[in-house]
Amino acid sequence: VQPSDRDEAVEGAEEAAEEVRQRLAAEAGDVEAMSVLGAMLLRRGDLDGAEPQLRAATAAGDRAAANNLGVLLHQRGYADEAAGWWRIAAVAGSAAAAHALGRHHRERGDEPAAEYWLRQSAEQGHALGAYALADLLEHRGDAAAGRWMRAAAERGHREAAYRLARALDRQAADEGDDGADNGVAQAAEAEQWYRQAAARGHQRAALYLGAILEKRGELKEAGRWYLTSAKDGEARAACALGFLLRDAGDTESAAVWWLRAAQDGDGNAANALGALHAERGETQTAERWYRAAMDAGDVNGAYNLGLLCAEQGRTAQAEQWYRRAAYAGHREAANALAILLLQVGDATGAEPWFSKAAEAGSVDAAFNLGILFAGRGEEAVALRWYERAAAAGHTEAALQVGIARLRDGDEPEAERHLRCAAGGGSPEAAYRLATVLDARRPPAPAHELGESVHLTKSECEEWYERAASQGHRRAQVRVGMLAAARGDVVEAARWYREAAEAGSRNGAFNLGLLLAREGSEPEAAVWWTRAG
């Protein structure tokens, strides 16, 4: 016999012995024993055995028996008779009966009576009564609901703890930048209540707690709570656990949890499975999961189907799926649809979709609108869209704003945008920023080739080098010229050669000059010929 089986056997024997003791006492006329025995039989589901014991105890004035008799009658479908016994017990001071009576009245639409009895229960410290009162008050928008929800949570009601946490989360989000602490206090308290509810087995609280911990970088604990919630049947937690595992490099385990979540109707997990199979080249399986995501109400499924069809050259089907997602409000699908329409020459049809996507917050669509208007020669309108995209962090848009500001003579504003674009990785922006800074420098003293000169690199040189290292040919030529000016023949030759081999005529010509000065005239001639 396993220890757990032995423990259960011992517990069962103790319960049986206790029942015998209570039955003997009840048969001897002990009212409390009648009440306790009736409650034991009621919990076991023996309604026929429980009813005479509870009726006898109730007749003798036992309020707990009256409450339990109400529960028994309610289970048998005699709701009105049950309410009568609950009223007797509630008037005698039973908080549990007051709660049951309050719920009875609410189910029948009598809210004033429901509130009266639920308040009686809550004010006696009954957790279920406090929660039911809070729910009633919240339903009609009464601000007092929060007080009773908190009271129920403090008395151990897990759903109350969860709902209190959700309310605090909403307060933290609403407070945002307007509050003294940006909602930090509410968010911290919300986490505490999520933790309490999750510890009591609330699966959604465990999900939200996991999300908070993941956002904070506490991935191990986040994973534990996601796992707890997922095992209890929360599909969103299974999906989130899958993403954690994928990010940790365990794609196979991630797929197991995504499959579990997707089979339970989670569209996000179905999309993740679709993407996984698409990466493996299993397009038919990917398409099946994207369709499952769409059927689950996740509009990303239609968007991903569009992407899949576009990659396979199925343009008509791609357009169909993009349209479906775009009409459902998917901004990136609207942008993708506009690009597809542009590619087939329908600029008129593309513009409204770019606009719709941009207005919905698509940064790429705002940039694409800039390109569209610039192509029509509407520079002022194009600049407005570029500025909008640049303000949201779009690197190429920031470059275009920088170029426009340079053209307008607004060098400080141009420099600001070029710095943003260059910092975002644009080699063209790095080169143009370097030229702006270069123009401000006083001319450096000339040096003979081969003469070693040690100077601290200026900021403009650093930007030239960054652009050059990213393959920008004009930057490579300029870095070569700066190296030559310092007398560093080897470095100059390296950069000229890189530019020349990438097709730069200036790079080829300068490399030829350098080689000729070094006495390598035959090779110099080759590069001059290439320079044309």
Where are the model-predicted features located?
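Residue-level detector of the short coil/turn that links helix A to helix B
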Residues: 45, 77, 109, 140-141, ...
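Short helix-capping/linker turns of helical repeat alpha-solenoids
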Residues: 29-30, 60-62, 92-94, 124-126, ...
